[in-house]
Amino acid sequence: MLSVYCLASAGLRRIERNQDAPLPEEAVWLDLLEPTPEEERLVEARLGLDIPTREEMREIESSSRLYEEEGALYLTATVVTKLDTALPENAEITFILKGTRLVTNRYVDPLPFRRFVGYSERHPQANTNAQAVLAGLIESIVNRIADVIERVGSDIDSASADIFNRQRLLADKHRRSERDFRKLLERIGQSGELIAKARESLASLARLLAFAQQSTIAMTPEVRTRLRTLSKDVVAMSDHASFLATNLNFVLDATLGMINIDQNNILKIFSVVTVFLLPPSVIGAAKVKKAPDARRGKLALIFYGLALVAILASIPWPGMPAGRPLFRF
């Protein structure tokens, strides 16, 4: 789908056009969302561009993502999308700036693009040319990633409180046994996946912004200032995301340690139960009635004496370490 936007007094305005109609001269932003081959050829012929294919957009080399060609600036970024679903993912979006027009090529519909259009309608003075539209789109993407990082930070704090909050544990003695470590591990895993995708997206945006500032394409001082500010924001967010990743690993290790402690407690319970059940089992297994020699004189006394010693040795006497028998056989 090809969406065409032009500048108006009320901000960006989408132009309704027929499928076969030529591109209007006043177009500032051409947004290609899952474009058809015909739409790609139309934009390429009108602006003299070579729009990257979906496979080319996925290439990880910087030379394939960030370059200048025939007076056009090509910028491809990895953007985290589908954050409101159970399976967030990263997708590539290409920005092409040539002259007074901006072209975006994408195969996902992330929330920052829709937010940017709404913001432009409320603040028409913020987007006066194609360069400002480019800066505005990147700002919207960065703000969305900031929301993700803040949400992950809150999730980590909540998970940490579930593990280490002593007041909560003392208020409810049964809380520890009622905690669902499976759900806790799922929350930690989801937070880890989100923070990893956010860090990947931030690294991509950092390279994009650095290349855009060093490009030979003419940009207004205002736009360059906005790009420098975004670069600083991305660096700060990357550092904070790295801190959260480290903290998340600590919470994960603590959760696994709690699981190990609970497993050991269960094993202790089984050990105590075994202490009380083993002596009767030994006596029952002896089958005294079927041992005729044991009924005769001293042999019977010796046999019953050994059984009594086994019972006494199995009892946890006061002062003995838990789980340690009196005698070792």
Regions from the language model: what does each represent?
Residues E38-E39, E68, T78-G257:
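Extended amphipathic alpha-helical scaffolding segments in membrane-proximal extra-membrane regions
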Residues G48, K232-F329:
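Hydrophobic alpha-helical transmembrane segments and their immediately adjacent juxtamembrane loops
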